[in-house]
Each structure stands twice: as C-alpha cells, then as structure tokens.
C-alpha cells in the first residue's frame, strides 16, 4: 500500500511536466508484479522511449522490474498496434475525466478518481481482480474520437465519466456498443438516459428529485399545515413549488410568506392547534439563517405552536455553530447524501487519503473523494452480483452517498436515494428514509 501512496503522488507530478506536453498521455496503468517497461511497451503498442518521455523518473532504470501498484503513464500510440485488452477474469473500470485540467474541474475530477482508486485497493485486499484505467478527457473543443477508439479497443467492464455535456452523446454510444454501464458522476442533465439503458446517473434529474422528495415529504408532513417562506435566492423553488402544487391538489391549505415577514404575519400563518411545517425555498446561508433566527425569535413564546422546518441539501454546509439552531427548530434537511465529519469511517478515509496523496480533501459538498470511493464500492459490489442493472447496493458501508438506482422508463438508471437529515439535540442528525 505504501508504494501505491508514493506513486499516486508522482502521478500528479508527472502529469505536470513539460515532457507530457510533447507526448500526450492516453491512460494510466497500475503495475502488477513482474512487469517492466519492456513488457508494458509490448502490451500497449508503444516504444520504451515514449514510455520514458511521460515517466521521466524511470529513465535511470528502464530494465528494472516496476514495483507492484506503481502508476505508469501510457502515452498515445503512434502506430495502430492494438492496445491492452482486459483479461476476462478482470473487472476493469475506465475513468474518463479531465484529470490534468487546471482549475476546479480538474481538481474535483482528480479527487473523485483518487477515491475510486482507494475503493479498488480495498477490493484487491479481498483477493479480487480489479483494474482502474484513467483516460484524460480532452476539452470540449477537441472531441473524444481518440477516447472512444481507446475504449473500443480496451473493452472495459464499466466506464465512469465524462464531465463535459458535449461528450455525453459519444460516450453514450460507445457504452451501448460495448454493452457496458456508463456511470455519469456529476451531471443530472443527460438526455441520453431517457433512451439508453446502459447509463447510470449519480445525480438524479430535477423531475425525479421532485417526485422522490415529494414521496418522502408527504410521508412525514402532508397532514401538517405548510407555511412556505420565500427567500431572496429561491434556489430550491422548483422542488418546493412541486410540493405546494401536490398539497393543493389534495385540498391541503398552504400559507406563503415573504422573507420580510413580521411576527404577526408568521403567527397568523401558523395553525395554533395543529402541527406546522415551515418550508424555505432557498439555500443561501445568510438568507436562511436570517429567516430561521426570526422564526425562532417570533415563536419562542408561542408555546402552543408545534413547528418543524424543512431545508435542502446545501444546508449541510452550515457550520457546527448553527446546528443548535437547526435542532431547536426540528429541522429536516432533504438530501441524497450525508457527509458526517465525525464518523470514524470518514475520518479514517480522509487520513488515508492524505497519506496516499499528500493532499487534504477539497472542502466541498459533496466530498469528491468520498463520492469516488462510494461509486467504486457500488461498481465492485455490482461485479459480484454479476450485473449493474440488478445490483441492489445493499449491505455496503458507504461513506457519504447511498446509491440506490431505479430504472427510468425505457431508458437508463438514476440514483433514487433520498433522505431527511433530522437535527435535534445530538451532534449528528438522525437519518429518515
């Protein structure tokens, strides 16, 4: 494992050298016992000189055996020699993301990829044969013809990617041609999922989220008086409006307030003898906290009012100092994932991540490393169940994203996981599914 940690750091370093600008990288190979540059040159149809041009740190020992687990950059082929074909007993995941791109896109893609690598390493510890191949996704202006050709020759067991919407169509076609699953990790706007059963979306489309969230909302709150408070940002208005429409269709009364409501406005909207649920349609922290503090202040003496608050996924990013307020208002945050910074499993993962890559995870929500790791767990579990289409994902100890895929009509699959994070007196919320 130590050697993997070392070479994964070199992976990023090597990508940044000027030599790579001259000889482009096509993929990354994780060495197995006994491999040499000579054997890799034969396997991938490239010259040793080309291998050394993208792996300059190996130039002093070209004939020496490569350490098991070492990541070797594989350059683009200058000939038509066939690339390495995955053995039948190997479950191979091809990751097509912009791993070398500067800025947020590259950083997030790289961290996701690293998390998936860690899941693969965990799988190997169980004696299973898995392989992760990295293919650098080109920019939107370059197209993915070379990437598609590589995938058709490699014949992976599953593909993860791409990032850019301009590449969805081509990647959808190659997944269909190979009859393998295409896991799109970031975007929810992939129209091909409606017709291609090979596609899996980690982020469900808005229409699916609306239905999933309504099912969960109605199970908990449909009999309570709903009071919607409009925020200045209104980033969650589509989902909230869907709930309101369904409630009105069922004959339920819904009250609506603007963000500058007075105490009397709020008390008039709340039902004095019935449970109430206050729903905000935004996620901007400043706006939300301003409203929640007003709600707490205005109802503090109104002991006859029973109140719960419903919020949204981005509220998870609120700092710990605000969790007490969320608990006092019986806040339920709607989400498809949950990052628990206090979890021993999460802490151990992030410590291992730092040891491997000499970097701390990006402070984002959701966490990219955990997302990649959870995706890997799902994929490798699906391998054992022999089908991504039939995989249940049960009994997997996910770090952050509970993946539960459901079929979308005659098309592909979308992540149908949905939960409420209920904040109370505890330092961590209860999960309600």
Labelled PLM ranges:
Residues 109-111, 127-190:
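Beta-alpha junction/loop-to-helix N-cap segments that form part of ligand/metal-binding clefts
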Residues 295-369:
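Extracellular/periplasmic periplasmic-binding protein-like sensory domains
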Residues 359-369, 373-432:
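Segments of small-molecule ligand-sensing domains
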Residues 60-63, 80-150:
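N-terminal extracellular/periplasmic Venus flytrap/periplasmic-binding protein-like
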Residues 160-162, 167-229, 233-243, 318-319:
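Extracytoplasmic ligand/sensor domains, especially the bilobed periplasmic-binding protein
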Residues 21-48:
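Primarily a LysM-type cell-wall glycan-binding module
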Residues 155-164, 183-185, 225-231, 274-291, ...:
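Periplasmic-binding protein-like
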Residues 1-28, 430-433:
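Bacterial Sec-dependent N-terminal signal peptides
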